[in-house]
């Protein structure tokens, strides 16, 4: 298989800037008249001329027809890693925060989904970005809502201390309520016949030898058993009990102490330590709400019950994406795929990912670790079934796009170099290859650095 020729970096950068400006100018016309725009014949244009329609012009740029199942996507990439690298990912806002156009109309025709394909527009042959944007909004809202539901339910229970717990359903009609206790007997319609012998209750009386009941013995005076406390013997020196006079003073004149002693005069004791008037529940709810806000801004996956730990993990992942991009290729690839799944929502199966992420925090961490291992295996073996399964969980076509193997001129695996370049954030800068590859004549050795760099998170997900 022949390696696709990669255009010059400066030419790609110029073509992109011109094509993007014209796309923004022609966007209202293309939305109003999509059929006429597609039916117009575009003239043959060279590399230096602006491209009017990327769909019709891309095959004319001396590029073979790409089959996403067997080859890599077209190398029409963002040359400097800037520009569209986070703008308008399938109609969303920056970094897929859903702050942009959420009605399914891409602001830039859905271009540059993950820094790889600039020629994906809203066509009937492709999955509609309207549905994807709706899934995007619903999924991001589901992430936050599930987070809010799980955390806020806990917060309500903590803060309100069961006040918001569902009350027992009581009917307005008291007759519908269940009667408690033994039901009352209805009064008899006829009076009872009490002429017969009464029912004998209690212990039967003792019988004598002949079977007659013995009469109860009459207690004799002096023969009763003495009960209670025995009488205190009188003291000879003490007067009669009945004649004793009670006084509030002792014999020495001091008052008798009875009951609780009076409070000590002087400085009053310090008040009890003031408790938190907000209560632990409301404080927890504030913490959780802050964590929810952080999660919504970061748009990370682990928006789960343990928000504090997840925020720390997600912030560390973002630091890995931004700073440690060189040493964390597989880690960044994992984070980028998962984060782009939730942020960009280019994927169809986002609902499953969101439910898994919302319900199983520990499982998400495990799957992230598995994805890290599988992605590292994919760099070694692009035909890894585990990586295909993981990509199928993210998008239905990930396995078709990332399992392509093409040998670069230097003998390097172009898929591995693409993955590594995407993880390094230099996919557009090196035009799909490592800048350190000495065997690649198209690899640029030096690139103009810009102060407006953005976090680049490729996902390698394409629609057929």
From Swiss-Prot:
The entry's DNA-binding region: 177-189, 198-210, 224-236, 255-267
InterPro entries referenced in this protein's UniProt entry, alphabetically: AT_hook_DNA-bd_motif, HMGA
Keyword RNA-binding: no
Region of interest called Disordered, as start-end residue ranges on this chain: 1-112, 125-464
GO process terms (BP): regulation of DNA-templated transcription
Biased segments, Polar residues type: 1-15, 161-174, 240-253, 433-464
One Gene Ontology term, aspect cellular component: chromatin
Superkingdom per UniProt: Eukaryota
Further details from the record: Several proteins derive from AAC-rich mRNA, which, due to a frameshift also have ACA and CAA codons and thus are Asn-, Thr- or Gln-rich.
Organism: Dictyostelium discoideum (Social amoeba)
Name used for this protein in its record: AAC-rich mRNA clone AAC11 protein
Lineage: Eukaryota, Amoebozoa, Evosea, Eumycetozoa, Dictyostelia
């Amino acid at each position: 298989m022949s390696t696709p020729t990669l255009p010059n970096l400066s030419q790609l950068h110029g073509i992109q800037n011109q094509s993007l400006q014209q796309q923004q100018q022609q966007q209202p016309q293309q939305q109003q008249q999509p059929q006429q725009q597609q039916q117009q014949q575009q003239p043959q244009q060279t590399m230096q001329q602006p491209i009017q329609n990327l769909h019709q012009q891309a095959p004319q740029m001396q590029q073979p027809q790409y089959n996403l199942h067997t080859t890599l996507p077209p190398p029409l990439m963002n040359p400097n890693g800037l520009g569209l690298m986070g703008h308008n990912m399938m109609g969303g806002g920056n970094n897929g925060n859903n702050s942009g156009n959420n009605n399914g109309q891409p602001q830039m025709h859905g271009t540059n989904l993950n820094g790889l394909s600039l020629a994906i527009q809203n066509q009937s042959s492709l999955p509609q970005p309207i549905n994807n944007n709706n899934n995007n909004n619903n999924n991001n809202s589901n992430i936050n809502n599930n987070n809010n539901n799980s955390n806020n339910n806990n917060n309500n229970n903590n803060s309100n201390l069961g006040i918001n717990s569902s009350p027992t359903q009581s009917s307005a009609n008291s007759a519908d309520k269940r009667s408690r206790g033994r039901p009352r007997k209805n009064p008899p319609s006829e009076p009872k016949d009490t002429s017969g012998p009464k029912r004998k209750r209690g212990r039967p009386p003792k019988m004598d030898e002949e079977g007659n009941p013995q009469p109860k013995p009459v207690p004799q005076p002096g023969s009763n058993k003495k009960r209670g406390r025995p009488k205190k013997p009188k003291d000879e020196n003490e007067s009669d009990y009945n004649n004793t006079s009670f006084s509030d003073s002792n014999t020495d004149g001091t008052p008798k102490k009875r009951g609780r002693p009076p409070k000590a005069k002087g400085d009053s004791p310090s008040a009890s330590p003031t408790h938190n008037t907000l209560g632990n529940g409301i404080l927890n709810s504030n913490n959780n709400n802050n964590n929810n806000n952080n999660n919504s801004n970061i748009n990370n996956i682990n928006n789960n019950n343990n928000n504090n730990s997840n925020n720390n993990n997600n912030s560390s992942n973002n630091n890995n994406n931004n700073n440690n991009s060189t040493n964390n290729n597989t880690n960044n690839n994992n984070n980028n795929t998962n984060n782009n799944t939730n942020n960009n929502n280019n994927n169809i199966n986002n609902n499953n990912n969101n439910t898994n992420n919302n319900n199983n925090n520990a499982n998400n961490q495990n799957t992230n670790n598995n994805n890290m291992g599988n992605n590292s295996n994919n760099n070694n073996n692009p035909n890894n079934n585990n990586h295909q399964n993981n990509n199928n969980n993210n998008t239905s076509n990930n396995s078709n796009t990332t399992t392509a193997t093409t040998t670069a001129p230097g003998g390097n695996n172009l898929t591995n170099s693409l993955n590594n370049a995407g993880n390094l954030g230099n996919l557009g800068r090196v035009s799909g290859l490592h800048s350190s590859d000495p065997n690649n004549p198209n690899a640029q050795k030096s690139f103009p650095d810009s102060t407006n760099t953005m976090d680049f998170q490729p996902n390698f997900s394409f629609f057929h």
